[in-house]
Amino acid sequence: MHFKQSKVLVIFLLILPLILNYSLPTKAASAQTSPALYVGVDVAFESIVETEQLIDNISSYTNFFVIGCTGNYNEDRLTTISQYAYDKGLTFIVYTDLPRYPSKQWLEDAHNNWGDSFLGIYFYDEPGGIQLDQSDYPFVTKADNYSDASNKYVSSLNWWLRSGPDAITKSFGTSKYQLFTSDYSLYWYDYEAGYDTVFAEFAQNYSRQLNIDLCRGAATVQDKDWGVMITNKYDESPYMEARIDLYSDMVLAYDNGAKYIIVFDSDKKWTQNVLTKDHQDAMKQFWEYAQSHPRGISAVSDRSAYVLPKDYAYGFRAPTEDRIWGLWNNDSLTLSVSMSMAALFQIFGNNLDIVYPNELRTVESIGYQNVIYWNDTRILSNLQPIQSPSPIQGLSGEQPTLLALIQQLSYMLFYAIVAVIITAVTVVTIVLKLEKAPAKK
């Protein structure tokens, strides 16, 4: 290689990190997550015949099944469907919201009859969402502050999962059984309460990536598993999203590392299935995609973490219009935290986890490429106030909206990259001119 070319290459290599890296502390490590994949359907309607027909239809392109109880705690029905799923080569779990269903005897028989194909119990649905919306039977209705709410939520839910005399795990005859749930908020605290796996819900028009980042982050820091539950988009027929959207959601979950990808199947009254042939075709198409695009082991060091304030359980369904623990309205931190998250989405894309401080295991020890705390002023220090076309909840029109913030960040990143490229070209040009200049005698 000529000397001139060597100099150009060296200069380019020196400048390249300026283009690729965001100037935050690096925390490199080799922590990794499992590439295993479970794909299936969560059936929440009653009919045994229709359930078996669905299993027949999907068993060639799924490997996982969720058996709902639909309010009818019938162990004979449960045994029949479990055996049918097992005979079709599916792994499966069972939903319940009663600590004594299935019975201890049924669970012992399940281990003997189906071995590792029966993975565990999906106990209680959406505990975090119920808390956030204060719907039927929330775990906390009154608290002195955020930390008090956190302690009460975790201890109350854990009482039903593991520590209380009637806890569901007291019926487990083997430590191999896992505890599952599906939720749309407070994933971090679901894990703290004792769940082994939480499915982040893809529902309505809420941000898929945001829920992935919150659930995956909680699972990663607490060394648990996570997945996605694609549930109803509408409150009435056709209930589920279109085929193309279902396929896209499954691919998104897969590409982000979800271990479980599940499609919910039931109408609002839990009386009949809602998945059409189009939906089943989308699942088959995804199965083929997963077979032709095998995942490697995803290193945590490829991702960055944004650390929220301790016990700041905001719902994040809107930049400033959700609630904290279901007990308080937004506060002075809400807007700045939402803006910081929007900025980091723009910078890191799907390589961002959103987490909380962990007393047992520091976030820095996990192995993230970058760890950014909520009060790191560098995130927003260069943003200027811009006029909002529609001020939110009486906030000043000078406050940036989430959309405007993203647009502004796009311009900033564009101009920064252009500036770096111009600098690189200038430096290379000067070096080349110096090479051509006659040497002084």
Give names to the regions the model predicted.
Residues 1-33, 58, 395, 399-441:
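Secretory targeting signatures
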Residues 29-393:
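Glycan-processing catalytic domains of CAZymes
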